[in-house]
Amino acid sequence: MPDASLFNGTSFITLFAPNISLFQASIDFYTDRLGFAIKETSNQKLVWLQLEEDSNNVSIQLLLDPEHAASVSQIDQNIRNLTRSLYRKDWRSIQSNIAFKSSSLSKLVKLLKDGGHPVQQSPNEISPFEVYTLDPLGSLIGFSGFKNPFAVNERSLLPKVSEEKAYRTEDDSEKLFTPIRKTIGVMTSGGDSPGMNPFVRAVVRAGIYKGCKVFCIHEGYEGLVRGGEKYIKETQWHDVRGWLVEGGTNIGTARCKEFRERSGRLKACKNMIDMGIDALIVCGGDGSLTGADRFRSEWPSLIEELLQTERISQQQFETYQNLNICGAVGSIDNDMSSTDATIGAFSSLDRICRAIDYIDATANSHSRAFIVEVMGRHCGWLGLLAGLATSADYILIPEKPASSREWQDQMCDIVSKHRARGKRKTIVIVAEGAISNDLSPISCDQVKDVLVNRLGLDTRVTTLGHVQRGGTAVAFDRIYATLQGVEAVNAVLECNADTPSPMIAIKEDQITRVPLVDAVELTQQVAKSIESRNFKRAISLRDSEFVEHMKNFISTNSADHVPPSLPLEKRKKVAIINVGAPAGGMNSAVYSMATYCMSRGHVPYAIHNGFSGLARHESVRSINWLDIEGWGSLGGSEIGTNRTLPNDADIGMIAYFFEKYGFDGLILVGGFEAFISLHQLERARINYPSLRIPLVLIPATISNNVPGTEYSLGSDTCLNSFMEYCDVIKQSAAATRNRVFVVEVQGGNSGYIATHAQLACGAQISYVPEEGISLAQLEMDINSLKESFANDQGKTKSGRLILKSENASKVLTTEVISTIIDDEASGRFDSKTAIPGHVQQGGIPSPMDRVRASRFAIRAVSFIEKHSDKCQAFKNSISFRQTDEITSTAVVLGIHKSQLRFTPIRQLYDFESDVPRRMRKNIFWSNVREISDMLSGRTSL
């Protein structure tokens, strides 16, 4: 048995068991597995256990005491939670532990694993310093080979070998090292998409971090079938450096007819066994994932056939009994059910929107119509969101077909009305899978002929084609592809033979696992539903926001051109104001709010230049449709914005103008200043009846620091602008060799941008206000840089990036940190600073910010419609009381796990905000920081 002694010299420890079964199981665990002896049994409910060879007389007092013990359900739940996080989290960060010393960790690990006990080894299974396990009561028990638990420079636990024997044959190396946890193969298949490289990078580094070998399988299933070191290559940590910024897939992709046959899959099976691969991660479309799952289901029969034909040994047959498969969806079409977004979809949408923004200029110059064809096969997601983001005149998508006569009449009616009101350009977006309701395809040439023959428009056709696939991934795809890659590694490590093959999905902005077979089946049902003309079911199988986006496009597209949908008595006067610093999506929110109001019959007003503009200059203008045409694609704030609060501007005058214009509702678009403004307006209701109207805040700030939401307009635009800036800076650092750039990030006291930018840019280090900068951490980071550059000799892409939030430290400024690094480097590398400043606000808003601005604005108007009559009841009340019913009409509209929700400002201000620091109390991006540090190889104190 392994000898052990308690680190801190404690004389005894007491453990409580809730029932006789766990009491006896605990005795067996400590005696049979850990080498304890029963020292004393004074009664049937008390046992003293002591180590047989312990000079310190350390004992464990085990009591059968249901009153003081945790319940059986609590113990079971705790063990389940810890076991579930075995490969995800360090147990020491979750639960306190008892630490012992052991002179034979390998023997201890074998004893524990033979007994079926979960074992976590640190830092990895190849050369562990510490081992942790769980006893039957859920207690966390630790063992170390060090006399000092905090030592890290003790002798190596591996056998010493002479230099000439450092390189051994495969058989010899197996004797020197403990077995690798898993050998993972990762491949990309089907059509390429931006974000595949970040996904592969994450799989490689997460796998290595967790003690696995990782092989990249080149050329998709073709490479798997051909096999050999040319196609199946072991990949090291540094091999994937720089992959974040590269588009497409660096390991190649190809369609493989041979893999569709059993003979091809048999070859693939043999090739994987030859390389020792027992887990496969596939990034591709539904066809690729279907093939992977079929491969897994046939695996037992494939290895049986290989054994019978003597192509593998009996030992190999026993070793590779099971194959774990995990899929991730790489597709620009966003056509997979069970996930809200596929890897590459938002990057493709960005290409489309940029192209249409460029086309807008020439279309406007010549007063032309442009037909733009986008990809998508059976899915109209790209066409729909591109139409919404660019304010296209008309879209044709597979999910909403109409008869040939109907779509032609409808399109011509809308386009002619837009032209009649002074619009010079026409944009029609056609998805490549667009069909009429008789399933006949609709081509761009057909659409062109209709516009030319019926309206006499000078019309051009633009087919974007493979431009939509090209280029580097946007921030969203880099971040979520990386998170999915890490989760895919966790999945193959946690799955067993009975676990259905998982697919990594995004649901409600969270990375989740869904059964791969079910997701593929639902996806294929979309095509079947369209073929059977069941178009309602086809739409229902899309992501949760698809139908809402469709309705929003129809509503905003018909603004001011068709009779309003509300009766006269239901129509309102709705005002909108921008407050705080500019943010991408502000103009999109104003445009969508105004056009939706027009379609409903409301009168939209814009308050220019914030509350100071209203109080000092009565800057109120009703909004005309033609005046805001094209605003959805503009950055900044066309109606002006500043940081002046209502109390500072003169809240009495503000209330007066609200009364004068008879506003029935107000929408505020802005950041923390808008949050405080909403609070002040809500508080002032008791004195000013004109403020007793529905008040809605749409968060819009690059800092993403508004309480009540996990997403603010402008944050995605900021991330993309900052990411592009960092890509250029990192390129400069790499070209110069041995250079570090310390880049300052905006965001106030919020580390949201710095944290996500670290993941998107591949920065080695980020400092954020939530953590601050300690001298110990800075010293460790500098030592890490020294080691990193020392290991880079002869390697390319050797530049480094450090991100520092502007408020991470008042003393350790960007310049100071750079100077310290420069001094400590002693000429081995140098350090420079880069401060992008207000460049981070971005120019043209990202498609995500545009689309979400539209969704936010329309939901805000709907909220005002719903609560306006309720407010009217107490608007002129003399005895005004702030009841829950009243306070619920002044709200922040936010996203929580992809769901839009309205939260009263009073609740957020009183309980969920840190007003002095201009921050929310709940920090929801901590897990992203952990993953960022893991993938950059950084150790955080």
Curated annotation (Swiss-Prot):
Active-site residues, record numbering mapped to chain: 333 (proton acceptor)
Region feature (N-terminal catalytic PFK domain 1): 2-558
Location relative to the cell: Cytoplasm
GO molecular function, one term: 6-phosphofructokinase activity
Domain of life: Eukaryota
Oligomeric and partner information: Heterododecamer of 4 alpha, 4 beta and 4 gamma chains. The gamma chain bridges the N-terminal halves of the alpha and beta subunits.
Protein name, per record: ATP-dependent 6-phosphofructokinase subunit beta
Source organism per UniProt: Komagataella phaffii (strain GS115 / ATCC 20864) (Yeast)
Lineage: Eukaryota, Fungi, Dikarya, Ascomycota, Saccharomycotina
